[in-house]
Structures are given as C-alpha cells and as structure tokens.
Amino acid sequence: MAQRTRLGDILKPLNSEYGKVAPGWGTTPVMAVFMALFFVFLLIILQLYNRSLLVQDVLVDWRSLGR
C-alpha cells in the first residue's frame, strides 16, 4: 500500500483533473498559433545561417564569433 506523504498531499490537487478532457477544441488553436510562430522563428534562423536572408551589418561567419 502506498504511503501518504506531505509532498503527495500538496501535489494531489494537480493530479485531480487526470483523465478529464475539455469539451470541444480547448486550447488547440492557441497551440497552433504558437507552433506557427516557432516555425517562422526557426525558418529565420535557418535562413540567416544559410545566408539566404541577408541583414545589414550582421556577419554570419564562424571566425567572427571568436573575436
């Protein structure tokens, strides 16, 4: 049998919603927006690294990182 602890009593309310699903789409649209923004961020970083997006006065060179 599991032993009750003070930490377990504190954390129990966090687990009380286990198995319950919010009706409808819930926060899925919000998650989709943040995923799209993160994708754009990664795309910009990749383009800067690949030099397909040139920004004035920004050097993308490994030697410039050692200065």
Swiss-Prot record:
Gene Ontology annotations of biological process type: photosynthesis; protein stabilization
Organism: Nostoc punctiforme (strain ATCC 29133 / PCC 73102)
MF GO annotations: phosphate ion binding
Subunit-structure text: PSII is composed of 1 copy each of membrane proteins PsbA, PsbB, PsbC, PsbD, PsbE, PsbF, PsbH, PsbI, PsbJ, PsbK, PsbL, PsbM, PsbT, PsbX, PsbY, PsbZ, Psb30/Ycf12, peripheral proteins PsbO, CyanoQ (PsbQ), PsbU, PsbV and a large number of cofactors. It forms dimeric complexes.
One CC-aspect GO term: photosystem II
Highest rank taxon of the organism: Bacteria
Role according to the record: One of the components of the core complex of photosystem II (PSII), required for its stability and/or assembly. PSII is a light-driven water:plastoquinone oxidoreductase that uses light energy to abstract electrons from H(2)O, generating O(2) and a proton gradient subsequently used for ATP formation. It consists of a core antenna complex that captures photons, and an electron transfer chain that converts photonic excitation into a charge separation.
Protein name according to UniProt: Photosystem II reaction center protein H
